[in-house]
Amino acid sequence: MHRNDSQRLGKPGGAPESLQMANNNFLSTLSPEHCRPLAGECMNKLKCGAAEAEIMNLPERVGTFSAIPALGGISLPPGVIVMTALHSPAAASAAVTDSAFQIANLADCPQNNSSGAGGNPAKKKRKRCGVCVPCKRLINCGVCSSCRNRKTGHQICKFRKCEELKKKPGTSLEVRGDDSFFPCLASSLIPPFSPPFQCFLSPFKMHHSFSESPSRL
C-alpha cells in the first residue's frame, strides 16, 4: 500500500499534478498585473456609488437647493461649493452667505459712485481772457497789498487781474463795445461816433474805470 501510494504521488499524470496545474491557472488569472486594473475599477465604482449617495442625500443635509442662489451669480466655483457641502453643511451655508454678501456689495458700488459723482461736480477752472488791459500788463506795480504780501499771499497784482475773472462765475460774458473795435486804444483816444451809431453801441458799452493808471506808479 505504501509503495502504491508513493508511486501514485510520484506519477507525472496523477491527481497532484492536475491540482497543481489548476492552482497555477487560478493564480495566473489573479496575478498582480491582472489584479491592479480590477482593483482600480472596483475602487472607482465604490467612489462613484458613494458620491451618488452623498448627492442624493445632499438636500436632507444642507436643506433644499432653492436656498442656494444660481451658480452663475456666485463668486466661488460651483465645484468648491458642492465639495464643501459634501464634507461640511455648515461650511457650505457659510460659503453661500459670503457669496450673497459679495454680490450685494457689488450691486451697491455703482450706486455709491454715481451719487458721489452727482453730489460733487468738478469745478471748471476759469482762464484769463488775454485781451483786456490788465491781461496785457506784464509788470507788477509793487505797491498794492497783493504785491507787498508776495511771500505770504498768492493773489496776482491788482493791476494785472483780468476783468473777466473779477466777474462772478454765474454771469455770462458781456460784449465790450468800444474796446472790441479798438482794444489797444484808451477810451479818450477813440473818436466820437455819430448819434445813430452811439445808440447802437449803448446797450453793449462798458464803462471802465481808469482811476488807477500806470502813471501813478
From Swiss-Prot:
Q: Name one GO biological process term.
A: Wnt signaling pathway
Question: What are the TM regions of this chain, as residue ranges?
Answer: none
Record-level GO cellular component terms = cytoplasm; nucleus
Please list where the region (Disordered) is annotated.
1-20
Q: What is its main location?
A: cytoplasm
Q: Which GO MF terms are attached to this record?
A: methyl-CpG binding; zinc ion binding
At the top level, the lineage of the source is Eukaryota
Where does this protein hold Zn(2+) 1? Answer: 129, 132, 135, 162
Where Zn(2+) 2 binds, per the record, is at 141, 144, 147, 157
Q: Where are the zinc fingers (CXXC-type)?
A: 122-163
Keyword terms of this UniProt record: Cytoplasm, DNA-binding, Metal-binding, Wnt signaling pathway, Zinc, Zinc-finger
Does this entry carry the keyword Transferase?
A: no
Localization, per the record, is: Cytoplasm
The family database entries (PANTHER family) matched by this protein are listed as: CXXC-TYPE ZINC FINGER PROTEIN 4, ZINC FINGER-CONTAINING
Domain remark in the UniProt entry: The CXXC zinc finger mediates binding to CpG-DNA.
**Function description:** Acts as a negative regulator of the Wnt signaling pathway required for anterior neural structure formation. Ectopic expression induces ventralization. Binds preferentially to DNA containing cytidine-phosphate-guanosine (CpG) dinucleotides over CpH (H=A, T, and C), hemimethylated-CpG and hemimethylated-hydroxymethyl-CpG.
Q: What is the designated name of this protein?
A: CXXC-type zinc finger protein 4
Report the source organism: Xenopus laevis
